[in-house]
Amino acid sequence: MFKRITLVGFGLLAGSIAAAVRQKVAIRAVSSKSTLKRAKDLADEFFEYDDVKNWLPGSDLILLCSPIKHIISTIDVLQSNANLLTGEVMVSDIGSTKEEICEKGFALPKPFVFVGGHPMAGSEKHGFEHSDPSIFENAYWLYCLPENLAKLPEPMCELLNFLGSRPVQIAPNDHDFAMAWLSHAPQLLSTSMAAGISPEVVKNHLHLAGRGFRDMTRIAGSSWGMWKDILETNRKNIDEALGIYAQKALEIKSKLDSGLEDDFLLGNETRHSLATGKNYAYPLYEVVANIPDEPGSILKALNPLAAEGINLRDIELMKVREGVGGILLLAFKTENEAESAIKILEDRGIHAVSR
């Protein structure tokens, strides 16, 4: 694995990487002075962005973790300072679009070796204060190789394996096309729901919002600073996807009186084909447990599973009614783990079934 990783930009994902690997790898944090002052527990060395003559030499991996436009400008900085290096240095990034970044990165001169990257992990929260070393566990890490590389270099494979992520190769143009449909346009649809809701509903009835509205508007809380660059660097694909989504919404609106069964069936089929869990690379096996409305009820369900060595991959408290109880959704990697969990919970008087 790499001996020293330089993280340029120190937000949620950079902080999460640092938290996960710091015991095995030396971490250099490159960011603004104000961020560096607050990140003392997550790195070993600290440099401001313009101190490139000190943070560039001696790095095994330079991972660009800032917003997309800053990633692109940092690649220019690396190119201008290649003379500072005496040996090969790998450069990668975590940007949410890939074509513009990879076009720049693949053109870096030796001794740089650039591989485009995009970990399919994150949160509507931002800032390294919310760092989570397990955020990459079982999540895809998409990567783009230049023509002169046949496979992902071994040190990068070791890093991704240590983080628990699942590397998947993809071409930069395929990446941006897919992300427009699966991430970027959905972000705008979520934003349109949250921003376009009736002011009367906001004023008088918003407290009635159920899980459907909350789920669909969750990502509307995302950072504009990050999304501004995404929209600018993937405009063509997003425009196409958003236009077709909008066209379908109008089509559904026009069919309100004539029946929407076929659309519902197609939507059901697409939804059910998704792997369960947060960007997981394989389906998870779900168990639904009924828990009472009393202090410690969640722990009473989870502690026996931990005692038996059964590892949870995902958990969600779905519904709670005061005085009645709630529904706890548990997800497991294997069917055997799910079946064992059901038996353990049932033996302790907690009704549980597979979902």
Write out the residue ranges for each language-model feature:
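Glycine-rich, N-terminal phosphate-binding loop of Rossmann-like dinucleotide-binding domains
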Residues: 65-67, 95, 145
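A conserved regulatory-domain signal marking ACT and ACT-like small-molecule sensing domains
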Residues: 270-355
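Rossmann-like NAD(P)(H) cofactor-binding subdomain of soluble oxidoreductases
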Residues: 74-129
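Internal alpha-helical scaffold of NAD(P)-dependent oxidoreductase catalytic cores
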Residues: 135-221
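Rossmann-like NAD(P)-binding element
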Residues: 52-86, 90
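NAD(P)+-binding Rossmann beta1-loop-alpha1 motif at the extreme N-terminus of oxidoreductases
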Residues: 1-54, 61
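Interdomain hinge/lid region at the active-site interface
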Residues: 202-268, 287, 294
